[in-house]
Structure formats: C-alpha cells, structure tokens
Amino acid sequence: MDIIDTALPDVKLLKPQVFTDGRGFFMETFRDGWFKENIADRTFVQENHSNSSKGVLRGLHYQTENTQGKLVRVVVGEVFDVAVDMREGSPTFGKWAGATLSAQNRYQLWIPEGFAHGFCVLGDAAEVVYKCTDYYNPETEQVLIWNDPAIGIGWPLQTAPLLSPKDLAGKTWAQAEKSALRFPDKKCRPNVSDGIFSDRLPTRLQYALCKEKHPGNEERQAQPRSGGIPVLQIQRERRIRAAVGHREGNNKRHNYTNQAFTDNQACREKRTDTVGVFQTAFAVFRLLANDVFQHRRQHRACHDGHIDGRRQINAHTDRKDGQGKFTA
C-alpha cells in the first residue's frame, strides 16, 4: 500500500495495490504486520458496517474514554470522510482533515485514537466498513456538531444533510468534552530511549506518568494500573512472559511426545515378550505332541503285530486234525 499524508500528520490515507483483468479485480485490504510496522502498532477488536442513503451525514462521533482508532473504507458508493483532533495539547488540536473515499478509488483512511469521526454521502447511497481498536462504549460517546464554524469543516454538500436526532443534538466545539487522551507538550515528553514512550501516539498510561506537567487535568487522567512502571518495561515483561509461556508449552509438548514414545516402546517390548512366551509355549506343545504321536504310533504297531501273531496261531490250530496233522 501507498501512504498519503493529510492535513493532520497522524491521519493517513492508504492507497492499496489493485490487480484487475477481464474477470474483475483483486486487492489486499489489510495486513496486520505491515500496518503495525508502517502506520501504528494497534490491534483491531471490532469491525462495523453501515449503509447510508443519499444526503446522509453521520457524525462527528468520538469517545472520551475507551478511545477508538478507526481504519475506514467504502465498499459501495462514495463519501467525504472527516477527522477532527480532540486531543488537548496536540499541535493540531481542533483542526480537521478530510478525504474522499469510494468503491472506485478504494482508499482507506486511518484515524487514530482521540479524533472525532464523521462522513457525508456524496452519491445515491454508500456502505462504509471500518475497523476499531477499542469497543463501542455508549456511556462515553460524544457528538460534535457537524457545522460548528469554530472548526469550519468544508463539507461538499449541495443541500442540507439528513441527520439523526443524536447528531442534531451535537455539541459545539466550546461545549464539547474533549478526549481523555492528552497530547503532552514537548517539554514534558520523555525521550524514547528513557523507556517511557513506545509509540508516536501516547497512551493514557504515558500521560499519567507525566501528570505533574498537566495541572488541572488530574481528574481526567487515569492512574497507571502498573504503579507507574514505564511502558517499554511493561511491554518487555509481557514479551518475556509470552516467551516463557511459549517455551513451557513447547517443553510440555516435548515431554508429552517423549512420554508417548516411551509408552509406545514399552508396549512394543511387552508385546514382543508376550509373543516370545507364546512362541515358546507353542514349540513345547509341538514337541510334546510329536512325542505323544510317535508313542501312540509305536504302540499301535506293537498292538497290530500282536493281533497278527494271534491270528496266525489260530489259523494253524484250526487246520490241524485230531492227530495233529493239518487238513487241507
């Protein structure tokens, strides 16, 4: 993908590489490793899909807590997509950037955490799909009015937009509650080498680490759950725990494999021993059977010889006359 800068340095326009032929087209819309390396180290947890008719304007929406980063693209129609920086302390605080997203140009807009987001439909209808880095929280959702002159968004509208009751009741810039995500000034922002800031976009934990540099904002700044441990140290410990867990899992699998091999080997040895016992018993049985068979055959031969001798004697006796002579 190609990365295109916008009026806000943290808001990026992404142009995908599209392959077309007579059958249609193919493109890769998202690759996690590339996005984390080139745009922001974020994990998306929710994806939304909206359909809007002609003249609809949605926004400007943001959450003061559980701030959401959004990766927006259009799958049907065309919209003008807008982001407004709501981070106090940011060099672009209160400024906006916009881009035209359509199913034809297939652009995507990355809007980091701490920005308000909205869009208006430019054609007959539009379908918008966007990924979020945090879950939707209606309790902390805020609406910034779409036409506040203090911001001065240049919506490309021909007629008055169609708005929801919630968007109609949006607050002006002066009334709106700003994002809980703070952008610290350069004087209090520690060096990356100090192991405190791990990314270009600070987190609430990082703001809490330098809260003494932001007087008056203590009630909005969450206490670090880790007790003020630097972010890089936390990430390093998480990686170590993950590596240890992975190594332990491999060891368990290795042990299971060894145990299975040992059990299989023992089973084979046991089976071999059993076969040997049966073979020995069968050989002994054959020897005994042969001895018995030979003994019975010899006994039969003796018995037959004895019977033949008796028959011959009886035959001679029957052929003798009274004087002891044989008769014809």
From Swiss-Prot:
The record marks 136 as: Participates in a stacking interaction with the thymidine ring of dTDP-4-oxo-6-deoxyglucose. CDD domains: cupin_RmlC. SUPFAM superfamilies: RmlC-like cupins (SSF51182). Keywords: Carbohydrate metabolism, Isomerase, Lipopolysaccharide biosynthesis. Substrate binds at residues 23, 28, 46-48, 58, 70, 117, 141, 166. It catalyses: dTDP-4-dehydro-6-deoxy-alpha-D-glucose = dTDP-4-dehydro-beta-L-rhamnose. Transmembrane segments: none annotated. GO terms for cellular component: cytosol. One of its GO terms (molecular function) is dTDP-4-dehydrorhamnose 3,5-epimerase activity. The active site is at 61 (proton acceptor), 130 (proton donor). InterPro entries: RmlC-like (IPR000888), RmlC-like_jellyroll (IPR014710), RmlC_Cupin_sf (IPR011051). It comes from the Bacteria. Pathway: Carbohydrate biosynthesis; dTDP-L-rhamnose biosynthesis; Bacterial outer membrane biogenesis; LPS O-antigen biosynthesis. Homodimer. Belongs to the dTDP-4-dehydrorhamnose 3,5-epimerase family. Catalyzes the epimerization of the C3' and C5'positions of dTDP-6-deoxy-D-xylo-4-hexulose, forming dTDP-6-deoxy-L-lyxo-4-hexulose. This is dTDP-4-dehydrorhamnose 3,5-epimerase. It comes from Neisseria gonorrhoeae.
